[in-house]
Regions:
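Catalytic-core regions built around general acid/base machinery
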Residues: 41, 45-46, 142-149
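Active-site environment of divalent metal-dependent phosphoester hydrolases
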Residues: 10-15, 34-40, 58-64, 92-95, ...
């Protein structure tokens, strides 16, 4: 399966969005931190029937629904025999009406969710990329716990503004995407789009 992931497009040029026009993919997930204006630009080049999303820590509630994009936060969906679960937002590091959670809130929500073949989120597992002192980018303990408990085949996220691929001890393939990439779940190849 080819999965198009788009995330953290805080700035997007029309010529970047145009690169999506001829791509072959089975499903597209928006993993947050993409403003409504940029989602509209992306949708000009995407197959709208294949697009799902979750919110990031800078997104306004309702931005996906206003564009008829299914929000899969804490929802399990199945596509071509593969199950996907989404988890939006990040660790709460500031005030405001944005999708952010305390560690306890995230654990309470995510641990009620069912097992999925592929877990998708905006934020990362706790301390995977930092020492935990940077509250904005320290990650969520609930994600680490979910991965340990359910051992998804893939865990894909954004938020860190890096492209990275790691395999954890439990064989979960952890992929951090910055902007746009296609992930082939059979070959485990990653193609960076922009």
């Amino acid at each position: 399966m080819k999965i198009l992931i788009i995330t953290d497009c805080h700035h997007l040029l029309p010529e970047e969005a145009e690169k999506l026009a001829d791509l072959e993919y089975d499903v597209c997930f928006l993993l947050g931190d993409i403003s409504g204006k940029y989602i509209d630009m992306l949708l000009m080049y995407l197959d709208k029937d294949k697009v799902y999303g979750i919110l990031g820590n800078h997104d306004e509630f309702g931005v996906l629904e206003a564009r008829n994009i299914p929000n899969i936060h804490c929802k399990l969906i199945e596509i071509n025999g593969t199950s996907f679960l989404g988890f939006e937002g990040s660790n709460r590091y500031k005030r405001g009406e944005f999708p952010m959670f305390t560690q306890k809130e995230a654990r309470k929500l995510l641990m009620k969710c069912p097992k999925a073949d592929i877990l998708l989120s905006h934020d990362s597992p706790y301390k995977l990329y930092s020492d935990g002192k940077d509250l904005e980018h320290c990650g969520l303990k609930a994600i680490s716990k979910y991965i340990k408990k359910y051992k998804p085949i893939f865990y894909i996220h954004g938020h860190q503004h890096i492209n990275s691929k790691k395999t954890l001890k439990n064989e979960t393939n952890v992929i951090c995407v910055y902007r746009a990439s296609i992930i082939d779940t059979e070959t485990k190849d990653i193609t960076f789009i922009f």
